[in-house]
Amino acid sequence: METWRKGSFRNASFFKQLSLGRPRRLRRQSSVLSQASTAGGDHEEYSNREVIRELQGRPDGRRLPLWGDEQPRATLLAPPKPPRLYRESSSCPNILEPPPAYTAAYSATLPSALSLSSALHQHSEKGLVDTPCFQRTPTPDLSDPFLSFKVDLGISLLEEVLQMLREQFPSEPSF
């Protein structure tokens, strides 16, 4: 009905559409493709065979995305799934409680590994019912190699920081 309202009888493409026996969907897509190819220039023009081949699909089942398509491409192949790390949850290693072989192997190289694992075992053996509400954190062991580190910022960086502090707080004479 809309073709009558538009006055398409006078238009030459109306008779072309009647004479070509294409399905409606293919006609719309090929017209969009031909418009885009002529707008792009001579080097991007398609022949009719190439347009029909791309609209119908390739031998491997994939189809090129077309400008006029509203629905997503269901015929494109999905990427393969990544391999699963663990087949079942029982084979997943327990990170909170390391096995005794682990603590024995690393107790010589890391002195804090044994104390950390024993603290984890003691904490996991306690129930949640008998724990007090507020626990004090233990004082850190200063002989622990993980806690005794020094940061060397360098003289120039320290001088820049002091200069910035002097500029921001000119009333403070201590900088």
From Swiss-Prot:
PANTHER family per the UniProt record, alphabetical: CDC42 EFFECTOR PROTEIN BORG, GENE 14137-RELATED
Region: Disordered, residue numbers: 24-92
Gene designation per UniProt: C15orf62
Any GO BP: positive regulation of actin filament polymerization
Location(s), subcellular: Mitochondrion
Protein name (record): Uncharacterized protein C15orf62, mitochondrial
A single GO cellular-component term on record: cytoskeleton
Principal place of residence: mitochondrion
Signal peptide: none
Transit peptide interval: 1-11
